[in-house]
Curated annotation (Swiss-Prot):
Transcription factor predominantly involved in transcriptional repression. Binds to promoter/enhancer response elements that contain the imperfect 5'-AGGTCA-3' direct or inverted repeats with various spacings which are also recognized by other nuclear hormone receptors. Involved in modulation of hormonal responses. Represses transcriptional activity of the lutropin-choriogonadotropic hormone receptor/LHCGR gene, the renin/REN gene and the oxytocin-neurophysin/OXT gene. Keywords: DNA-binding, Metal-binding, Nucleus, Phosphoprotein, Receptor, Repressor, Transcription, Transcription regulation, Zinc, Zinc-finger. The lineage of its organism: Eukaryota, Metazoa, Chordata, Craniata, Vertebrata. Residues 1-15 have a biased composition (Gly residues). Binds DNA as dimer; homodimer and heterodimer with NR2F2 and probably NR2F1. Interacts with THRB. It comes from Homo sapiens. This is Nuclear receptor subfamily 2 group F member 6. Residues 1-49 are annotated as: Disordered. GO terms for molecular function: DNA-binding transcription factor activity; DNA-binding transcription factor activity, RNA polymerase II-specific; DNA-binding transcription repressor activity, RNA polymerase II-specific; nuclear receptor activity; RNA polymerase II cis-regulatory region sequence-specific DNA binding; sequence-specific DNA binding; sequence-specific double-stranded DNA binding; zinc ion binding. Pfam families: Hormone_recep, zf-C4. PANTHER family: NUCLEAR HORMONE RECEPTOR. GO terms for cellular component: chromatin; mitochondrion; nucleoplasm; nucleus. Expressed in heart, placenta, liver, skeletal muscle, kidney and pancreas. Residues 165-393 form the NR LBD domain. GO terms for biological process: cell differentiation; detection of temperature stimulus involved in sensory perception of pain; entrainment of circadian clock by photoperiod; negative regulation of transcription by RNA polymerase II; nervous system development; neuron development.
Length: 404
C-alpha cells in the first residue's frame, strides 16, 4: 500500500517524493478496468502484430500495445499517465521492493511507478508534456546570451521555451538563486574582465559567495522544511562543494598569487613538501572551476547540481537519511530531463555534469578555508560560521558585509 500526494515523480527508480501531507493512504485505484476503447496513447506503428501475444512489461498482463515507449496493458498505461499528468508522488509502506504483477499491481503505487520507470516508460512521452524532437537553441552559454538572461523568465515563473515549461523544481531552484545579479556584481567588483584581484577583494568576494551559498540553501525547495539540525548537518558537509560551484557560476577571476597571499603563505612559509602539496590542491581548486567554465553550465544546471550536492544522505546525524536521498534523486531527475530537453544534441552532457560532483569533493574544505577565510576569521571553523549564518539568516554580519 502506498500513500499518495502531489509532487515530482521521476524516472530514476526510487525518485518518488515522500508524502509531506501526512495524510492517510488512499485506497489503491484498480486500473484493470480501464476501458480498452479509451483514447489511445499507443505510439504509431508500435501496435502488436496480429497473432503475437505480448505481455505487459510492468505487471505481466496482456498488453494492448506500446505505450510511452514499452508494451503495457491498459491498466499500467492509465496508471502511468495519471501519475505523470497529476504530478503524483507515492510512498511505499514496505521496503520499496514490492512485487508488481497482475495480482499485486494495485497494492503499492510507489513500487508500481518505480517499475514503470525502470522498464523504460518515458515521462516526457505523456501527451500533455510530450517533448518535440527539435527544440529551440540552448540557453545561456550555448546561445551566446549573457549568463542567466535566457532564464530570467523561468526564475519568475515563465517558460524556458514556448510550450515546454521547466519543471517546478528547477523554477524554484532558480528563484532561490542570488544570481545572475550577484554574478555581475562580483565581476564588476574586480574591475575589468580578467583582472587580477587583490588580497582584500579575494577575501571580500569569498565572504559574499559563502553568505550567498547559505542564503541559497535557506530558500531552496524542501530545505526549509527539514529539521534545523538536519539543515546544519547538510550544509556542514556540502558547503565546500557549493562554494566551488558558486565560484564557477559567478566567474570569480582567481589567480594563484593573491590566493596564496590571502592564505598567509608569504607571511608564514611552510616546509617544501607541504608547500608542494598545498600548491597541488590550489591547482585542483582552480581546475574544477575552469572545467565547469568550459562546460558552459547554465543557471538551471547549476541549481540542480547544487541541490544534488546539498541533499547528501551521508551527512552525519540526519533524522531521516532516506528522505534526504529522495530529495537528492528529485534534483537528479530534474537535471536529467532538463538536459535531455534543452541540449538534445549533447547526449553526454548529463554524464559530464554529474561527474563534476565527485571531482569537487577532491578539493578539501580545509584548503578553501585557508585560501579564502584565514584573514577573515582566523582559526574559527567555517562550519561554525555556516551554522551561525543559517540560524541568524539575513541578520548575520560579516566583517566585509554581504551587501557591499
Amino acid at each position: 500500500m502506498a500513500m499518495v500526494t502531489g509532487g515530482w515523480g521521476g524516472p530514476g527508480g526510487d525518485t518518488n517524493g515522500v508524502d509531506k501531507a501526512g495524510g492517510y493512504p488512499r485506497a489503491a485505484e484498480d486500473d484493470s478496468a480501464s476501458p480498452p476503447g479509451a483514447a489511445s496513447d499507443a505510439e504509431p506503428g508500435d501496435e502488436e502484430r496480429p497473432g503475437l501475444q505480448v505481455d505487459c512489461v510492468v505487471c505481466g498482463d496482456k498488453s494492448s500495445g506500446k505505450h510511452y515507449g514499452v508494451f503495457t496493458c491498459e491498466g499500467c498505461k492509465s496508471f502511468f499517465k495519471r501519475s505523470i499528468r497529476r504530478n503524483l508522488s507515492y510512498t511505499c509502506r514496505s521496503n520499496r521492493d514490492c512485487q508488481i504483477d497482475q495480482h499485486h499491481r494495485n497494492q503499492c503505487q510507489y513500487c508500481r511507478l518505480k517499475k514503470c520507470f525502470r522498464v523504460g516508460m518515458r515521462k516526457e512521452a505523456v501527451q500533455r508534456g510530450r517533448i518535440p524532437h527539435s527544440l529551440p537553441g540552448a540557453v545561456a552559454a550555448s546561445s551566446g546570451s549573457p549568463p542567466g538572461s535566457a532564464l530570467a523568465a523561468v526564475a519568475s515563473g515563465g517558460d524556458l521555451f514556448p510550450g515546454q515549461p521547466v519543471s517546478e523544481l528547477i523554477a524554484q531552484l532558480l528563484r532561490a538563486e542570488p544570481y545572475p545579479a550577484a554574478a555581475g556584481r562580483f565581476g564588476a567588483g574586480g574591475g575589468a574582465a580578467g583582472a587580477v584581484l587583490g588580497i582584500d577583494n579575494v577575501c571580500e568576494l569569498a565572504a559574499r559567495l559563502l553568505f550567498s551559498t547559505v542564503e541559497w540553501a535557506r530558500h531552496a525547495p524542501f530545505f526549509p522544511e527539514l529539521p534545523v539540525a538536519d539543515q546544519v548537518a547538510l550544509l556542514r558537509l556540502s558547503w565546500s562543494e557549493l562554494f566551488v560551484l558558486n565560484a564557477a557560476q559567478a566567474a570569480l577571476p582567481l589567480h594563484t598569487a593573491p590566493l596564496l597571499a590571502a592564505a598567509g603563505l608569504h607571511a608564514a612559509p611552510m616546509a617544501a613538501e607541504r608547500a608542494v602539496a598545498f600548491m597541488d590542491q590550489v591547482r585542483a581548486f582552480q581546475e574544477q572551476v575552469d572545467k565547469l567554465g568550459r562546460l558552459q553550465v547554465d543557471s538551471a544546471e547549476y541549481g540542480c547540481l547544487k541541490a544534488i550536492a546539498l541533499f547528501t544522505p551521508d551527512a552525519c546525524g540526519l533524522s531521516d537519511p532516506a528522505h534526504v536521498e529522495s530529495l537528492q534523486e528529485k534534483a537528479q531527475v530534474a537535471l536529467t530531463e532538463y538536459v535531455r530537453a534543452q541540449y538534445p544534441s549533447q547526449p553526454q552532457r548529463f554524464g559530464r555534469l554529474l561527474l563534476r560532483l565527485p571531482a569537487l569533493r577532491a578539493v578539501p574544505a580545509s584548503l578553501i578555508s585557508q585560501l579564502f577565510f584565514m584573514r577573515l576569521v582566523g582559526k574559527t571553523p567555517i562550519e561554525t560560521l555556516i551554522r551561525d549564518m543559517l540560524l541568524s539568516g539575513s541578520t548575520f554580519n560579516w566583517p566585509y558585509g554581504s551587501g557591499q
